[in-house]
Each structure stands twice: as C-alpha cells, then as structure tokens.
C-alpha cells in the first residue's frame, strides 16, 4: 500500500477479519467492527490465511515451572550474539533471555574483553569458548550484533540439530547456505526486519536462482518498500524458499511457517523502533523457545511446526508489553513513550508475572 491513501474512522467487516487487518495496514482502518453474521461455526472447516493470537492464547503458550522443575528442565539457551564491534548486542540479548526464566544461558565467545563485560553485567550467564558443536543446549540464538570474529561460530547453527533463532547477520548466512541445495527446516527461525529480508531475498535470488524460479516464478527481488507494502506475501515467500520459519519484524510482526501457517502480532508500540530492540527480542524468543522445547523433550511429545510460530508470537507480545511498561516502571500502568532496550529487558519479569496472574 502506497500513499496517498484515505484513512477511515471506522471499518465494518463481515464474517471474519480480512488479511490486511492483521498487518500494519490496519492503521488505515480506524476502529474495526466485526459482524460474524452467525456463520463462524461453518468456517471451522477452513484453514485461515493468518491467525491473530489473543491474551489467553499467549498465557496458554507460556511454559510455567512446577515443584519438580530444575535448571535443565527449564531449558538451556546457547547464545552466539554480539562481538567486539557490537558488545551491547551480547549484553542486551543475554539479559533479556535471563529475565524470561530460562534455566541457563550459555554464552559463547573467544573474546576475553567480551567475556569480562558479560561477567560484569550478566553474571548468571555461563561462558564457553570452544566449538558450539560440543555444547549441550536446548535451543540456539545467534546473529544479533555478530562481527567477523563471531560469524564463523554462527555458521554452525545452520545445520545444528537443535532449533536456532537466526537474527541479523545470521540471516545472510542462511541465504548463502541455500546455495548448497539444502533447506533449513521449520526449527530454524529467521528474524529479519524488512531491510534484512530484502537482503536475504536478493542473496537467495543470486545463489539459488532455480529455487527462486520454482517458488516465485519470474517475480523480481522486492525492495524494502515492497516488503513493507506486502509483508504477508514476502514473509511467506521467504519461508517457502528456505524451509525455515520466518519472523518478519515490524509494526505488525508476521511469522510464517513453511507449512503455510502464519501469525500476526501487533508490535506493542512504535517506540520500540530503536537500536538494540531486535537484540532484546532475540533473547526473549530464545529463552521462551528453550523452555518450551525442554518440556516437550521431557515428555517425548513431537514438536509441531506451529510451535515455533506460536512461541515467536508470545515473544513479540511480551516485548511490546515490556516496552509500554518500561515508560512508567509499572506493568499495571503502561504508556507509550521512549523504550530503550535495557529498560525493556528490566520489565520482563513483571510483565510475565502479570500475564500469569490474569
């Protein structure tokens, strides 16, 4: 959607919400009123193009420890974030993960300076310097703030058996990986914003033109503006091309799985559009997913494809709630306003506690 566009005061829609109302374009709709016309039951046989989760859905998705829980049943998150160039990304992503209740964070770096910073600011994290392949973790998270000294470690995440959240520079590695003819699988989660998705798609178009043609025909590589205009289309396209789950971050975050299931989550507040916000979200998502996968591993239940999307939606929701709570320092009195990433991370325990108390 490109300007000029008339903005409505109110939009009336029938039977079910239409796709654009689950994207950033809903800002043009004003107050939305849905009239079901008494037919929702008849729609249950159809698969929706997109799902929008409610607060109770988020509550049901959140894993809660019990009297028998210990740190390993709470999940171990391996993190390969930050670098000497971007040490803040490591500190913020790890702090956010720790504040979401994961059993352990194992942080990997060969940098003595970064290790000392981590010990000073996040002493709960456990440090390792060896190869990621020998570490015992439940879920990996990497790419946020990665520099030349850490990208090589991040390459391991592309073929690691564990689920992995691939942010920022790791998305580029994922695009290059497709040149081998391999696919990533739904347990690999790409978390680009529109600019990073543009770069990902351009790389795929260059290194895997056959796959591009098979899935997208003669479609040209979209610009960032194109992706902003059609986020649903391009998140789905990236998932189809890669076989991965794709979280396209924005005012409305679109999460697309390779089986076609797609979720939409409002971003909470536009004040989250700051440096460090994505690093914090990586830590939140990694911590929540590690807890979920640990529980499923204990029960020997299979991990459904939609699990990665649902937990991702929960992460986006908590991120937005913590941002609004950070303005007042009180989750019971949230407001829109400046929300620096470090403040957002501080509010996560209270926001999670309030979700559980509802």
Could you describe each region identified by the protein language model?
Residues 1-3:
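Proline/glycine-rich low-complexity loops and linkers
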């Amino acid at each position: 959607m490109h300007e000029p566009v008339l903005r409505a005061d109110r939009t009336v829609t029938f039977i079910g919400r239409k796709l654009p109302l689950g994207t950033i374009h809903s800002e043009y709709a004003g107050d939305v009123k849905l009239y079901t016309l008494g037919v929702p039951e008849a729609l249950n046989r159809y698969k929706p193009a997109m799902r929008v989760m409610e607060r109770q859905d988020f509550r049901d998705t959140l894993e809660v420890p019990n009297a028998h829980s210990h740190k390993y049943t709470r999940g171990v998150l391996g993190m390969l974030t930050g670098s000497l160039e971007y040490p803040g990304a490591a500190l913020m992503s790890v702090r956010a993960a720790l504040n979401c209740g994961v059993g352990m964070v194992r942080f990997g770096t060969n940098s003595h300076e970064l290790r000392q910073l981590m010990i000073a600011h996040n002493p709960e994290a456990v440090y390792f310097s060896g190869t990621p392949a020998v570490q015992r973790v439940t879920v990996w998270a990497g790419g946020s703030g990665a520099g030349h000294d850490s990208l090589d470690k991040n390459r391991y995440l592309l073929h690691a058996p564990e689920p992995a959240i691939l942010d920022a520079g790791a998305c580029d590695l994922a695009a290059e990986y497709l040149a081998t003819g391999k696919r990533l699988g739904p347990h690999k989660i790409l978390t680009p914003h529109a600019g990073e998705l543009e770069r990902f798609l351009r790389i795929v178009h260059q290194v895997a033109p056959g796959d591009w043609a098979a899935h997208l025909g003669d479609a040209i590589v979209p610009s960032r503006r194109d992706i902003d205009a059609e986020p649903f289309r391009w998140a789905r396209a990236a998932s189809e091309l890669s076989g991965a789950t794709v979280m396209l971050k924005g005012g409305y975050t679109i999460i697309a799985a390779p089986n076609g299931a797609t979720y939409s989550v409002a971003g909470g507040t536009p004040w989250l559009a700051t440096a460090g916000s994505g690093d914090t979200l990586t830590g939140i998502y990694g911590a929540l997913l590690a807890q979920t996968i640990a529980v499923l591993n204990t029960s020997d239940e299979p991990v459904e494809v939609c699990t990665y999307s649902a937990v991702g939606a929960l992460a986006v929701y908590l991120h937005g709630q913590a941002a609004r709570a950070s303005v007042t320092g009180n989750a019971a009195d949230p407001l829109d306003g400046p929300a620096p990433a470090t403040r957002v991370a501080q509010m996560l325990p209270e926001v999670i506690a309030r979700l559980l108390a509802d």
